[in-house]
Amino acid sequence: MRKTPMAAIAAFALVAASASAANVKVTPLGTHDGEFCAQDRALVFEDPNGTRILYDPGRSVAGAEDPRLGKIDVVLVTHMHGDHAGNIHIKDVNQGECGKPDTPVSSMPKSLAVEVALAKKSKIVTGSEMQAFFAAKLKANGGNAADSMLARYGGSVTVGGVKIATVTAMHSNGLDPDYIGGPVADAMKANGFAGYVGEATGYVLKFSNGLVVYLSGDTGITKDQETVVRGYYNAKLAVMNIGDGFTTGPAEAAYVINDLVKPNEVILSHANEPGTQGGKVRAGTKTEAFMKAVKIPSHVPLSGKTMEFDANGKCVSGC
């Protein structure tokens, strides 16, 4: 039986829709629409089965009611620095400059991560001793302490069909005393102390379509990027910090990608600069330097622009 042209078109559309449904969607939530800005950290990963993971809400999410969030099943936090856990944040997008956005809203002493988890009734997944900290914060603010879940080094948890494993990140993780408050916090600040909540972490996510993603968090160069992230997990897509000073810079980050992790593609993160203007990479930036140094396709996380990746970490839409 020969198909009519309309039947053939319908069949093609069905195949295309099925292929798209098997992809992982990644949506950056930055401070300025269509740009990659200095405080941009947050990404939303959406599994083909609908599970949505907010990675490091930081300062670029406009509170728990930010309409860009939608449903959030998991809040994933790499460490407790304010630009990742969220000590302050924007009130709305496109306020201030890309290099210095307005962040007038405080989330202390809870953190934006906790505020989002409470509002969305989502889990918070962390490694090291951060799990106990978030459990206490959730309980103190009317939530369920059990919603703070631990994936310690070498182990993993699965939430909504997505496997989350903790990997090494070489970075500090001091807890700002303002998360504690009161005379204890005052004494800590007066003496230059930060609280201990364990080591900073990176993560490896395995989605239901088979895609394995490495999330660097804030890190330097580590042997585990080769032996664990590539050797064991075989990550096909990476999200890599490039900001320098606090983390690997463009050259170091490119070495991690080219020689250690060796994914098929990479998304830039944590540039600490206005990396784009009008959606185009600015000349002379760390963003440009990294993209020139890596040997694989690299993608700038333009705020609000959804990218789709197949099981091999290849961008098939939005890049």
Label each residue range with its predicted role:
Residues M1-A8:
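Bacterial N-terminal signal peptides that target proteins for export
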Residues T31-V114, N173-F193, T219-Y233:
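Pre-active-site segment of Zn-dependent metallo-hydrolases
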Residues G58-D66, D186-D259:
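Active-site-proximal loop/helix segments of hydrolase catalytic cores
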Residues V116-V125, A132-G160, Y255-C319:
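Binuclear metal-ion centers of metallo-dependent hydrolases, dominated by the metallo-beta-lactamase
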